[in-house]
Every structure is written in structure tokens, then in C-alpha cells.
């Protein structure tokens, strides 16, 4: 591809709609880089966000690599079901990503993600080991082994539904007159504290959709965001034990999401690095660190 084409790909990702018939719908995919080469990297976003939120992180890599970033179920332009009845864990997100991997032609890819997207990537990697040659997980949501076991007990299964994350998500304002109003409401506050303006605007670009009653509304509804916080009957520890590819976890220094120690016993494929001065939102606040880890895995010999 000519250099001018690469520049356009970096600044303006192509937008694809990927039908997933085995999953009952479709996902929207941002496609960066040279389409003449196979997909190198698949990146999954965190709960409540969307693929475009990570443009600042991913776009510079598109000069050398072909990148897919899907909107997960219930986010962005995905059309997969968001029914919450009888939902118990993130197995749906993992299976959706496995279906995305099935749709990719070519050699195995590096699979990466942030927060819930990282955990979903982990679950997908053990379902499709032949399609993944490496994992990079930015502060994935992985509770302690004891907590994960507790979440599988019927008596404690609904405990997360009373957590502040769930309560606050359900209270979240979901409608705005326009994107400028949403920007003013979010800028410098809550989870968005410290975010560069460009990253916040990228989030809002795909994070808001037309409201039938006028104005804009959140693409990821408060109910779906809360459901993701409330269901944890999946087992990332079992998945890590089953991994057949090298895995690099970037753990936030000031974070409560990832409880994998730096030297996890019995997990020889997993390397954990605590990022100094980082929070759970390190892909937004320290993109160069995450980008470096992605590039290192992409450039590594195939070790899967």
C-alpha cells in the first residue's frame, strides 16, 4: 500500500460489519493498517467503552501491522443480543471473540484487550488456541482464586449485583443533547479524570447514538454495563492454566481489577508486569507503555 494509503488507514480506520451467524448477530470492527497483509492484532475494549476509544493507542501501530478492534456485545454498533436474564458470566464475550477469530483468514494473531476485553480475550484464547499466538492483557479483570470460587457458589452468585460499580452504572446519565454536552459532563470527572481530550472525544464519537426521542443516548446502556459488572461466574484462572501461548499482563499499580501476582504459581505462560504510577485506565493515560507491550508481542517469534 502506498504511504498515503497507510496514513489514511492510521487516521481513519475502515469500518467493517462482521456477521457472526453462530452468535446470532454482528459486530462492528475498526480496521487499521494494510489490508494486503493478514490481520496481526485483535484488540477488545473495556466495559462501557468501544473500539474507537483506543484510537490513540492503536493507530500508530497501523503503520506496521494490520489491526482489528471490534465493538463487543452491547457496545458501539454491535447487534448481538443483550438479554440479561439467566446471564452468569462473560462467556458470551469470550465466545463472541472466538467467532471473530474464526472469521480471520491467515496465521494466528496476537489477541489483546483492556479490562473486561482482556478477560474476554483470555477466555477466547483457550477456545481457539490454534488462532492465537500471544496475549497482551491491560489490567484484565481477574479476581483472586478464592473470590472466583465464591462467585460460583449459588449462595454468593448474586453478591456482585450489590457492588457500587453496579449501583453507579444503573444511575448513570444515559441521554445528552449533543456530544459537546456529554463532553462537558464527563471531562475531568470520575473514570474520565486525566483523559486526554482526544481520547474522550473518540469514546463519545461511537459511544453515543441517536435517541429516538431526540438528542443522543449511550450506545452501551446502563443496564448492560451493570450486567457486565454483576456477573462473574466465569473462571479466568482455569483459562490461564490452559493457555498454550505466551501471555503478558500489564497490571495497574493503583488498581483493584487484576489480582494475579507478579510470579503466578503454576502459570508458566503468564508474565505479569506492574506498571509504575498507573491506574486501571493505563491504555488511555499511558498508551506508550501498552503500545510497547503490543509491539513486543507482535514482533516476537511465534512461540505458541
Regions found by a protein language model. Name each.
Residues 30-82:
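Conserved HGGG/HGGXW glycine-rich cap/lid loop of the alpha/beta-hydrolase fold
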Residues 133-174:
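Flexible "cap/lid" loop of the alpha/beta hydrolase fold
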Residues 198, 207-265:
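Conserved serine/cysteine hydrolase catalytic core
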Amino acid at each position: 500500500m502506498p504511504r498515503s494509503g497507510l496514513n489514511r488507514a492510521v487516521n481513519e480506520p475502515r469500518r467493517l460489519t462482521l456477521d457472526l451467524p453462530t452468535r446470532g448477530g454482528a459486530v462492528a470492527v475498526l480496521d487499521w493498517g494494510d489490508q494486503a497483509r493478514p490481520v496481526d492484532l485483535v484488540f477488545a475494549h473495556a466495559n462501557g467503552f468501544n473500539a474507537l476509544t483506543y484510537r490513540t493507542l492503536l493507530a500508530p501501530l497501523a503503520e506496521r501491522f494490520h489491526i482489528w478492534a471490534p465493538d463487543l456485545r452491547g457496545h458501539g454498533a454491535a447487534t448481538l443480543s443483550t438479554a440479561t436474564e439467566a446471564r452468569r458470566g462473560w462467556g458470551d464475550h469470550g465466545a463472541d471473540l472466538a467467532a471473530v477469530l474464526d472469521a480471520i483468514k491467515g496465521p494466528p494473531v496476537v489477541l489483546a484487550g483492556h479490562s473486561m476485553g482482556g478477560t474476554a480475550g483470555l477466555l477466547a484464547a483457550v477456545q481457539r488456541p490454534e488462532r492465537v499466538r500471544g496475549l497482551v492483557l491491560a489490567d484484565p479483570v481477574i479476581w483472586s482464586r478464592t473470590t472466583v470460587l465464591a462467585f460460583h457458589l449459588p449462595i454468593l452468585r448474586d453478591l456482585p449485583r450489590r457492588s457500587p460499580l453496579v449501583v453507579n452504572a444503573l444511575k448513570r446519565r444515559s441521554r445528552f443533547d449533543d456530544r459537546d454536552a456529554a463532553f462537558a459532563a464527563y471531562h475531568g470527572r470520575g473514570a474520565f479524570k486525566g483523559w486526554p481530550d482526544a481520547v474522550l472525544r473518540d469514546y463519545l464519537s461511537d459511544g453515543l447514538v441517536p435517541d429516538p426521542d431526540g438528542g443522543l443516548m449511550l450506545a452501551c446502556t446502563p443496564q448492560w454495563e451493570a450486567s457486565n459488572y454483576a456477573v462473574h461466574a466465569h473462571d479466568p484462572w482455569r483459562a490461564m492454566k490452559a493457555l498454550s501461548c505466551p501471555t503478558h499482563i500489564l497490571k495497574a499499580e493503583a488498581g483493584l481489577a487484576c489480582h494475579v501476582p507478579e510470579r503466578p504459581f503454576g502459570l508458566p505462560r503468564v508474565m505479569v508486569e506492574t506498571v509504575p504510577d498507573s491506574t486501571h485506565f493505563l491504555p488511555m493515560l499511558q498508551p506508550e507503555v501498552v503500545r510497547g507491550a503490543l509491539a513486543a508481542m507482535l514482533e516476537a517469534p511465534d512461540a505458541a
